[in-house]
């Protein structure tokens, strides 16, 4: 599929102001530059947070449902409807939020909600008060705000460099790569499925939050210096 797509690139017009010759050396160099771009990397990782949460949930939730919540397959399927409802409603709300607030503000709010949600899930687990509605309620909220993260983070990441194609390719690589890596790490952690799920998503979300805040503060500092 990739070879076919590469072969068809000659059919498209050049969109860059300074045309760049299509060659393997140029392609790898451009992808390398895109992957090393801090802003693109951080916001692509935020897109990856959505995949990390979704993939880790898909891997861990069946074990959590069976061993901790004591649900059968049918009940697990019914409770999963909450997640689909959360995702659907989140997409509707996201379209309205984007019109009123800055993308970074929406992104930080969504990541903060995920962090707080997983902290609460951990507290429920420690105190032995984690219920089915508590677990799926928190994951439904996480799916709800994940619908805010994807459009805002992907928009910022794809516009971080001049070449949108390279930005998109690098973003998707970071997105899927982070998801695969975190699922693999979760599988090797010496904890039960619930704590592996909480730990991996929580740590990744905190790292994304720190990265976005760092970029945001640096950009504000540059603006202040410029206006002075």
Segments and roles (model prediction):
Residues 105-152:
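C-terminal transmembrane helical hairpin of 12-TM major facilitator-type secondary transporters
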Residues 13-44:
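Juxtamembrane intracellular "pre-TM" segments in multi-pass secondary transporters
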Residues 144, 153-193, 200-204:
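A late C-terminal transmembrane helix in Major Facilitator Superfamily
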Residues 1-18, 212-215:
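C-terminal membrane-cytosol helix-exit motif in multi-pass small-molecule transporters
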Residues 60-74:
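Short amphipathic helix-loop junctions that connect adjacent transmembrane helices
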Residues 215-228:
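Intrinsic disorder in cytosolic terminal tails and internal cytosolic loops
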Residues 36-56, 140:
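Pair of pore-lining "gating" transmembrane helices in MFS-fold secondary transporters
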